[in-house]
Amino acid sequence: MWSESRIEALTPTLAPTPTPHYERTMTGFLKVEKLAKAYQADKPVFADVSFDIAKGEFVCIIGHSGCGKTTILNVLAGLDTASSGNAFMDGREIAGPSLSRGVVFQGHALMPWLTVRQNIAFAVQSRWPDMRRADLNAHVEKFVALVGLSHAIDKKPSQLSGGMKQRVGIARAFSIQPKMLLLDEPFGALDALTRGTIQDELMSIVGQTRQTVFMITHDVDEAILLADRILLMSNGVEVDGHYKPGGIAETVINTLPRSRTRAQLHHLDGYYDLRNYIVDFLVSRATAH
């Protein structure tokens, strides 16, 4: 099947695993060790969550609402703390927010009184307070252009559509050149056409920058399109009077060619096998066992 733990069971009809576009390491650029979070001592939302992400790797996490995906992302962002366990990035333990990690949430979180240029410049100046004005403007304009918003650079958020606001958020996150990008369902509130367009832009930027990305999504096709690996997360469940916390149940390797596009995705050999495997997990196996 598709999980790393069951890779030996791959059938001959499935697409062969291509050479990854990143170099995998034993330690990982990001390392999560036995992470757990409990709001009630006897019922942790998740427990024993461990995974690595290699530098330049794009990893998506999928699971039902309430399983703890956003909590994990918030711990990685330094916005929340785990009940137990540790998370390390580039050899250092994560302890609080840092400009080395860019975060994009489902809501755009732009300052409404500032223009697109000023919103992004504010972030850039936080990272490089001594940057000259000319260099600052050039830097901001570069990342605004990457998301196709040069024509709207001097507009305020109230003058932008929802999709344009999300593009600004993505440009702002990339503009501080973080070591890692954390995305919490960044396209979840957008219509299908806008979502597809921004997915294309994200793939292009990630390809240019070789950015390391950890992304939450509920969209199976989105995960297959974007990710090198997909973490499948289970919900906690009561079994025979005992509570079993959720966690990372399976890790799926995306064997489709890295050069895939939205238009060709469903034509690729192995696409439906991969999609059906993930959907089957969500329907039949997404509880702790």
Where are these regions (language model features)?
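Conserved signature/switch motifs of ABC ATPase nucleotide-binding domains
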Residues: 155-158, 176
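Catalytic Walker B motif of ABC-type/P-loop ATPase nucleotide-binding domains
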Residues: 181-184
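Helix-to-loop junction immediately C-terminal to a conserved catalytic motif
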Residues: 77
